[in-house]
Amino acid sequence: MAKKIVGYIKLQVPAGKANPSPPIGPALGQRGLNIMEFVKQFNAKTADLEQGMPIPVVITAYGDRTFTFVTKTPPITYFLKKAAGIDKGSATVGRSGPVGRVTMEQVRDIATKKMKDLNANDVEGAARMIVGSARSMGIEVVEG
């Protein structure tokens, strides 16, 4: 018989830097899951990635206090900020000038990396989503 799922926990954890402090500890502790076991498994799975890169993770908690987790690709905003060379997006989008620039080639590159996590049929559709995210962050998308 399959294990009974008691809940899903969605977190964004820096790659290779998971520790039992908040937000991980309290989120897993509420479900009675072994926090240190998750920390060890997550850090081992993300050891080959760039340290500190935010990794979305979905943890499935089971009734017998076991868990499984799935890591996703980093958020679009992380890739856009890295490509534009900025620390954060604009606080006043549209009123002030753009805070950074990315090329369509960089957008397509981000789209291919994020394709499996996006709800798009092709890379061009994913690229359009990323252009929208860039605009909302105050990043200008230029051809080239």
Curated annotation (Swiss-Prot):
Keywords for the protein's UniProt record, in alphabetical order: Methylation, Ribonucleoprotein, Ribosomal protein, RNA-binding, rRNA-binding
Family: Belongs to the universal ribosomal protein uL11 family.
Reported modifications of this chain: One or more lysine residues are methylated.
The protein's name in its UniProt record: Large ribosomal subunit protein uL11
Cross-referenced SUPFAM superfamilies: Ribosomal L11/L12e N-terminal domain, Ribosomal protein L11, C-terminal domain
Oligomeric and partner information: Part of the ribosomal stalk of the 50S ribosomal subunit. Interacts with L10 and the large rRNA to form the base of the stalk. L10 forms an elongated spine to which L12 dimers bind in a sequential fashion forming a multimeric L10(L12)X complex.
UniProt keyword annotation of rRNA-binding present: yes
Biological classification of the source: Bacteria, Pseudomonadati, Pseudomonadota, Alphaproteobacteria, Rhodospirillales
Residues in the signal sequence: none
A Pfam family that the UniProt record links to this protein: Ribosomal_L11_N
